Design a protein with these regions (language model features):
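A glycine-rich helix N-cap at a beta->alpha junction
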Residues: 393-402
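Bacterial N-terminal signal peptides
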Residues: 8-18
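Soluble metallo-hydrolase cores and metallopeptidase-like ectodomains found primarily
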Residues: 32-35, 112, 117-120, 124-150, ...
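Surface-exposed loop and adjacent secondary-structure segments within mature catalytic domains
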Residues: 171-189, 234-279, 309
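Disordered, low-complexity segments in secreted/periplasmic proteins that are enriched in proline
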Residues: 24-26, 193-206, 211, 239
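Second-shell loop/turn segments in exported
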Residues: 36-43, 59-69, 135-141, 149-150, ...
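Short helix-loop-beta-strand segments that form the rim/entrance of peptidase-like active sites
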Residues: 51, 59, 361-386, 402
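Noncatalytic luminal/extracellular "stalk/propeptide" segments of secretory-pathway proteins
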Residues: 26-35, 54, 58-197, 257
């Protein structure tokens, strides 16, 4: 599949970089069929795309922006681009992004009434627990604002289960499938999302019930911080072995303006409660045991490290210079960073590997595009497209609006 993606990308790149108008009407330059055939042969018979993907996911592994892992992966990518003969391969700084973070050690277990390891993972930028915590957990089962009073004085130093059990539905069909031509045509012809409606992106307007749930969740987080909980456990999204683990929560009262709020990445961010996501199947079991009155006891240890000496991040950049139209640039790129709890294979080492393989093939064949082809491997995507936006702002145009 990645070989096919590379072949498609290369066809478009060569078309744009050589001056061939893709799908245009009227006179146009002819395709260099010999070059296309060479690209296909190199890509299908001598592909390195899976080796690139394997290295990124197996050796550096998770590539959280600001972490030692992503810096090692970026240096490797820059070195490979240079080895392949790309010009001006470098790490281009942007930021400030904020402090880096890495997980140094972690364990989580049910120890009473019987032993069982828990499938769980700390959230990014969570502090550590300063050693092993062993205690009976507190189930923070506040379903209304009035319920919060029942937990005053009970959360200090506690391991807290943040919310109720989440329903896990049975899967009777495969979660993934290959799209047919009819499916793709239907997607292509679909009406664009209406702002404020379903699928309307940032203009989506929550319902009254959703706003109430968000307000209650905020009050719970503020209470956890104020009371001094020792650790928060949350049910993970996903099921059947899939967990989604993102950034730790730093809650602010609603009356604090957004521009006055820190993020967990900020060097001077206020202290927060250590936070761990638990696989929903294991989390639900803990809730059921507590509701049955079982003497549940947990043992958790979280060890993390922050890196605040250098608050900048970087993108990996390299290019194949053009000839007579070298001042015109054809960009290809993919986000290089990932979250920390997996190896970031599909999101997005796959895309990064395809882009790297595309420029490798062009260099290997010695093709001379008219326009400059530039590759960008972006960081900070998972925190809001930060790296690519910084690059566009620096080299092309400032973004208008929020």
């Amino acid at each position: 599949m990645l070989k096919r993606c590379t072949a498609i990308l290369l066809t478009v790149l060569i078309s744009l970089a050589s001056g061939v108008a893709v799908g245009a009407q009227g006179p146009q330059e002819k395709f260099d069929q010999a070059a296309i055939d060479k690209i296909k042969e190199e890509g299908m018979k001598h592909s390195q795309v899976m080796d690139i993907l394997s290295y990124l996911t197996d050796v550096p592994g998770a590539r959280l922006t600001g972490s030692p892992n992503i810096k090692a992966a970026q240096n490797w990518a820059k070195t490979k681009l240079t080895e392949w003969g790309l010009q001006n391969a470098h790490l281009e700084a942007w930021g400030p992004f904020g402090r880096g973070w890495s997980l140094e050690g972690f364990s989580a277990s049910l120890v009473k009434p019987n032993y069982a390891p828990l499938i769980a993972y700390p959230k990014a930028w969570s502090p550590g627990t300063n050693g092993v915590l062993r205690a009976q957990p507190v189930y923070f089962d506040a379903k209304t604002e009035a319920d919060l009073d029942k937990y005053k004085g009970k959360l200090k130093g506690a391991i807290v289960l943040l919310s109720e059990a989440r329903e896990v539905k049975a899967h009777y069909e495969a979660p993934g499938r290959r799209q047919s031509d009819e499916d793709l045509l239907q997607l292509a012809n679909a009406e664009p999302p209406v702002p404020g409606g379903p699928g309307g992106g940032r203009n989506f307007r929550p319902t009254d019930a959703q706003r109430a749930a968000q307000a209650l969740a905020l009050k719970k987080w503020l209470m956890l911080q104020d009371e001094g909980a020792a650790l928060v456990l949350e049910p993970g999204r996903g099921d059947g072995g899939t967990m989604f683990v993102q950034s730790a929560t730093l809650a602010y009262p609603q009356d604090v303006p957004r521009d006055k709020q820190k993020t967990v990445r900020d060097k001077d961010a206020p202290a927060i409660v250590p936070q761990v996501v638990v696989a929903v199947e294991h989390y639900n079991r803990l809730i059921r045991m507590i509701e049955r009155g079982a003497p549940v006891e947990l043992e958790v240890n979280v060890s993390t490290k922050f890196y605040d000496q250098d608050l900048m991040s970087a993108n990996v950049i390299g290019e194949i210079p053009g000839t007579d139209l070298k001042d015109e640039i054809v960009m290809l790129g993919a986000h290089f960073d990932s979250w920390h709890s997996g190896t970031g294979a599909t999101d997005n080492a796959a895309g990064s590997a395809v882009c790297m393989e595309a420029v490798r093939i062009l260099q290997r064949l010695g093709l001379k595009p008219r326009r400059t082809i530039r590759i960008g491997l972006w960081s900070g995507e998972e925190q809001g497209l930060l790296g690519s936006r910084a690059y566009v702002s620096e080299h092309f145009a400032k973004r208008l609006g929020p």
